[in-house]
């Protein structure tokens, strides 16, 4: 049986929110089988649980935000990407502010935290959402076109293409394909950082956003080049971060996907639209479990490689 996973012991992190600049503490705790991933706003007078699911997404401007009632948690995608990359099904995430800390701008710190806590198997079958027919969302035309698609696939692979007319981006790969079953998430994807332009950062800060952003937690570019002294972590770090984001955005569906995802210029909003489009058509998906590892997609039974 392909089993569900949680962490062995609790672990903690402290950082600042990318947009709020607020200090925030995270406590990641083990959870029982079939709990799913649940954020808990412990800073409120009465703690509020916000479970991860597509309909919990209440805002997709600049990040993926989930909420219940008036309680929200912003910028969940990097932590969700780490959970997906490690195959974690069940987790409580206690948080003391309304935004997940940005840490180094990638998923690497979250992967390290979770692997340090230990990943353990649970006595319950892992439940996948298996895509059974193609689902697509599109927006715009010509140079404004963007789209995202899910198609049937015995496994989970992602292909993303970006289109940035910038010298620093043009000199790197604008498309990448990654198969989560390879077991190479930590090596090939997790370290890819969020990126932005100095002119956009200045405008965002004037609007009260990106207050916690800087060269230590993002790739920052002027009109011509990357400003970070250490350069890029991957030759194609820009598009790999888009894959990282997509893995996190799509994990908000609440279960691991079995599908081939492809996208052109997609972002948080379109990824969530794609999930909602999928769930709205009951003939497009089904719940799948695997009684034997031989039936399961390649690589899904093995633990993800450590650093």
UniProtKB/Swiss-Prot annotation:
Zn(2+) binds at residues 78, 241, 245. The active site is at 268 (proton donor). Its EC number is 3.5.1.108. It comes from the Bacteria. One of its GO terms (biological process) is lipid A biosynthetic process. It catalyses: a UDP-3-O-[(3R)-3-hydroxyacyl]-N-acetyl-alpha-D-glucosamine + H2O = a UDP-3-O-[(3R)-3-hydroxyacyl]-alpha-D-glucosamine + acetate. Pathway: Glycolipid biosynthesis; lipid IV(A) biosynthesis; lipid IV(A) from (3R)-3-hydroxytetradecanoyl-[acyl-carrier-protein] and UDP-N-acetyl-alpha-D-glucosamine: step 2/6. Its cofactor is Zn(2+). Keywords: Hydrolase, Lipid A biosynthesis, Lipid biosynthesis, Lipid metabolism, Metal-binding, Zinc. GO terms for molecular function: metal ion binding; UDP-3-O-acyl-N-acetylglucosamine deacetylase activity. It is an enzyme of class 3 (hydrolase). GO terms for cellular component: membrane. The keyword Lipid biosynthesis applies. Pfam families: LpxC. Gene3D superfamilies: lpxc deacetylase, domain 1, lpxc deacetylase, domain 2. Belongs to the LpxC family. Catalyzes the hydrolysis of UDP-3-O-myristoyl-N-acetylglucosamine to form UDP-3-O-myristoylglucosamine and acetate, the committed step in lipid A biosynthesis. This is UDP-3-O-acyl-N-acetylglucosamine deacetylase. The gene is lpxC.
């Amino acid at each position: 049986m392909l089993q569900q996973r949680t962490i062995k012991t609790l672990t903690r992190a402290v950082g600042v929110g990318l947009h709020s600049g607020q200090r925030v503490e995270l406590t990641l705790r083990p959870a029982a089988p079939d709990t799913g991933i649940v954020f808990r706003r412990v800073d409120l007078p009465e703690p509020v649980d916000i479970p991860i699911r597509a309909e919990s997404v209440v805002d997709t401007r600049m990040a993926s935000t989930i909420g219940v009632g008036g309680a929200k948690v912003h910028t969940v995608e990097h932590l969700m990407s780490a959970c997906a990359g490690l195959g974690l099904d069940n987790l409580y995430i206690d948080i003391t502010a309304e935004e997940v800390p940005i840490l180094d701008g990638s998923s690497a710190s979250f992967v390290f935290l979770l692997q340090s806590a230990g990943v353990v198997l649970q006595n319950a079958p892992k439940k996948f959402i298996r895509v059974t027919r193609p689902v697509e969302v599109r927006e715009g035309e010509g140079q404004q076109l963007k789209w995202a698609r899910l198609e049937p696939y015995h496994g989970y692979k992602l292909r993303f293409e970006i289109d940035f007319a910038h010298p620093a981006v043009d000199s790197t790969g604008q498309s990448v394909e990654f198969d989560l079953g390879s077991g190479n998430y930590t090596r090939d994807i997790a370290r890819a950082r969020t990126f932005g332009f100095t002119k956009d950062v200045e405008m965002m800060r004037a609007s009260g956003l990106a207050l916690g952003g800087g060269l230590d937690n993002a790739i920052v570019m002027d009109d011509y080049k990357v400003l970070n002294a250490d350069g890029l972590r991957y030759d194609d770090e820009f598009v790999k971060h888009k894959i990282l984001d997509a893995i996190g955005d799509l994990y908000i569906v609440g279960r691991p996907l079995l599908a081939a995802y492809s996208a052109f210029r997609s972002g948080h909003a379109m990824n969530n639209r794609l999930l909602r489009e999928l769930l709205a058509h009951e003939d497009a998906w089904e719940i799948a479990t695997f009684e034997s590892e031989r039936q399961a997609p390649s690589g899904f039974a093995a633990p993800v490689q450590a650093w």
